[in-house]
Amino acid sequence: MHDSEQEHSSITGCRVTYESTIFYNEANKFSIIVVKTNDPRIPLQACSGRYYGDRMLRFTAVGYELPRTKAVELELDGEWVESKYGYQLQVEQWQEIVPQTADGLLAYLGSGLIKGIGPKTAEDIVATFGPDTLNILDNEPEKLLQIRGITEGKLKDIEESYAESRVLRNLMSLLGPFKITPATALKIYQNFGPACVDILKKCPYDLCQISGFGFKRVDGIVRKTDNRLHSAERIKGAVLYTLEDARSKSGHLFLPSEDLVKETLLLLNAPIPIPEQRVRAEEVQETLRQMILHGAVVAYKQYLYSPRVFGQEDDTARMIAERLANISVAENIESALEAVRESLGITLSQKQEQAVRTAFQHGLTIITGSPGTGKTTVLKAIIEAFKNLHPKGKFALMAPTGRASRRMAESTGVDEARTLHSALGLGTGEEVGDGERVRFVDADLVIVDEFSMVDMWLAQQFFKRIGQHTRVVLVGDPNQLPSVGAGNVFYELIHSGMVPVTVLDWIFRQSKDGLIAYNAKFINEGSTKLYYGNDFVFVDSPTQIETARRIQDIYCKEAAERGIENVQILSPFREKGEAASEQLNRAIRERVNPFRSAEEEVKIGSRTFRVHDRVMQTKNTEKVSNGDLGFITGITTNSKGERLVQMDFGGDRKLTYTPEQLAHVDLAYATTIHKAMGSEFETVIIPIVKAHTIMLYRNLLYTAVTRAKKKVILVGHKPILFMAVHRADISKRNTMLGERIRLYCKAYHTERNALPGLQQAG
């Protein structure tokens, strides 16, 4: 009998048989299943209350990659957890117990667990090899070619599927102390390949390369069985983790050797209280020398890179220098310019004309300027001039985000502008393997807007896919926040001194949105002499609680007048007090979209979504991009009992989401300023509170203000606003892209004169 009085938190070696599936997600292999057992250790509260004739206990198990077949017994290790659905076993490790009888082998092989083997093939295999079947699969799989219907291609599928299953089980066993999920084990397998178990046995610190395995976590567990504090493997793991931490958190492509040694020592010695036992700087320096010698770290001057990041920067600099070295045929633009003036009915300023000319005189050019300085007009002129010069030519418009690309298409009057990921064939991910085939962009002219959002990795992918004879025009505002990813590509290109740059600095917007453009210019210059009026408003509020309350009132009023889709709250923080975006989202939703019925809402963990909610996609998919905004239009229940959520992201992008897909959706009445990069809204509301001062720099405020097309409302304490305006962001990202471009240009013996980085036209 199971002991109902005993406290149950975990169980190991629990033998069960699969009974039924409650839920299964094909995308991530997460499943909720009912299993049966006669194990007396099962807690009473976990057992099904129904009576079964076989007198076996039924309970619910949840986990990843759980076999859903009655052909094998399972041995489960896990923890008992209480959820809103009841007491469940959260499976941490499992293994199949395959019966050695002919019937057992037949059931196992024919269960579909091994790709390439169906019921008929399973019969033939067991009939041929009998009790030696599993030994054949383990050690001599090529003998399966004797079986009719198993080709070389099918054998490869069988080997890969069986090997992956076996490696994952071994990996789960090896990494048991880390309490990883099978999904994480799969991630490790995909990163290191079939040899992952051997690799991690030899050097467990390689786990630090996997997201979620920080050095401290890995080190704490490794030292329980291997307390060699001064081992080269431990020091190497700390070095690589320190470089990656600097890249992901601070945007640095490298660390100076002195800083790397210092930060690595802090990491290594944090758990060592006795000074005499601590790792010395000389030991880290010696390990670094060996890592450099073997290519595990790249040294450039006194700067140290991970090989992958060094390759991104160096490869990009080389491609840019090659593009600049290719003497581009300058085109006679004057007649085309005259045609543009007539067709568009516009008069271009000297700077704007110079920007158009430069685009057709060089293979790579940059146009910069703050809002209201006429960048869109210049883009229209370049497109029209290109059509005039090349009636059969092809051009492509791109931007880093879906919203920015759609805005680019709307403002220029072009049918289509695409995200960089889509145009470059990068799919929805953020990494591309070295062996992957490169797809070149088929265009004679490529224009990219919002290029300041492009990080080092994406810049490399972009230039790799643009032909050397394609003219490239990069457009952006270098005074905005740098890219979310590592590097400072746009700034480095501008200040390399090698790329022709036209700066548009005359504000043309003189009417209803004039104050926004002028005040953005003043903020960028560090001036607090801002003009206030109907389109640029400051609402004084001394405390964060009061600020949050006033923002809610203002939002409701503005949304009623302009529509929810045209009003956006932009906060410096996602989670920090009442004026952070998460807290504002919950408060505002209760006012503009309160609870109506259980049928019109769905709960995912601690989050709730309702019909009519304003939402944001937070991960790229084939249909929608990270940062896209939309509305929930309906919530239904399918035949399996799953709640399905209907979304409308505009145009033909009407999609249905499963509960798992909602993990990549947030409420979006309020968002962070970083998330709004590349977007524009009619009205923007910005909290300015003391609690956010750690983030309030000039470029953050400037970025928030320039998201507004018609109205900016600042709510908070004016001294905090002035502090932000005066506070230049002094944090510099470590990158040598500009210097590397100059060195490559020199190496290619560029014949033309080096153009000044900030070319003043006119």
Identify the role of each PLM range:
Residues 1-332, 762:
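Accessory, non-ATPase domains that flank or precede helicase/AAA+ motor cores in DNA-metabolism machines
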Residues 345-361:
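N-terminal pre-P-loop "Q-motif" helix
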Residues 361-367:
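Pre-Walker A (Motif I) flank of P-loop NTPase domains
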Residues 366, 377, 381, 385, ...:
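Conserved helicase motor core of SF1/SF2 NTP-dependent helicases
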Residues 628-762:
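C-terminal accessory regions
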Residues 374:
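Conserved glycine(s) of the Walker
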Residues 478-623, 633-637, 744, 757-760:
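Conserved helicase motor core of P-loop NTPases
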Residues 113, 209, 369, 399, ...:
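The Walker A (P-loop) glycine that initiates the GxxxxGKT/S ATP-binding motif of P-loop NTPases
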